[in-house]
């Protein structure tokens, strides 16, 4: 997972990627608080996300913005994530916005349940190495360039693999729009 984080950072510093970046958001997320997961894992995630310019070729889908991010778990034996997908954001009032995201996540958590382990282990069993990811966000624009938001994200294999305990995060993020 450390290699993936460094590769992600290297990609983001390349000139073509920098030219396409629309916004960056970072914050702290509660790790696995539920309600759609087991709550087995604990701690705080350090979250960083890059949001790219809208895809004009997908205007029929509402011109979503691609995003890529990382959630580095700080809890003992907690699952870290590297994710990406498409996001949509709508202004709902003068400075308020809501957003949703749909994508995939690669994680370093447990995928197989070992019958020799206790039933209530301290790691979520996620079944697959690659999971689907759904997120929702509510935010406030502090200025033309700065914003603050609360994001909830859920990662799950949707029953495709044997185990599917899922993983939730919720937290506060600050954003900077270029």
Residue spans for each PLM region:
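Outer-membrane beta-barrel translocator/channel fold
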Residues: 28-31, 58, 99-135, 139
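Outer-membrane beta-barrel "beta-signal"
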Residues: 46, 166-178
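Residue-level signature of outer-membrane beta-barrel architecture
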Residues: 50-54, 72, 88-90, 140, ...
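Transmembrane beta-strands of outer-membrane beta-barrel proteins
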Residues: 22-26, 62-68, 82, 96-102, ...
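Cleavable N-terminal export/targeting peptides
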Residues: 1-21
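Solvent-exposed loop/turn segments connecting transmembrane beta-strands
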Residues: 35-44, 71-82, 92-94, 159-165
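Short loop/turn motifs that connect adjacent beta-strands in outer-membrane beta-barrel proteins
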Residues: 18-21, 53-64, 91-98, 145
């Amino acid at each position: 997972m450390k290699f993936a984080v460094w590769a992600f950072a290297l990609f983001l510093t390349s000139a073509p990627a920098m030219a396409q970046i629309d916004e960056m958001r970072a914050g702290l997320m509660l790790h696995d608080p539920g309600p759609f997961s087991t709550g087995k894992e604990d701690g705080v995630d350090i979250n960083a996300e890059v949001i790219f310019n809208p895809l004009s070729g997908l205007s029929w889908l509402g011109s979503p913005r691609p995003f890529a991010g990382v959630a580095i778990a700080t809890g003992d034996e907690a699952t870290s994530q590297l994710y990406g997908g498409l996001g949509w954001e709508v202004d709902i009032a003068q400075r308020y916005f809501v957003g949703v995201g749909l994508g995939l996540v690669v994680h370093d958590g447990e995928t197989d349940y070992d019958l020799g382990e206790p039933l209530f282990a301290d790691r979520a069993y996620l079944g697959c190495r690659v999971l689907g990811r759904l997120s929702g966000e509510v935010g406030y624009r502090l200025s033309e360039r700065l914003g603050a938001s609360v994001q909830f994200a859920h990662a799950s294999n949707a029953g495709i693999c044997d185990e599917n305990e899922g993983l939730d995060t919720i937290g506060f993020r600050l954003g900077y729009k270029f």
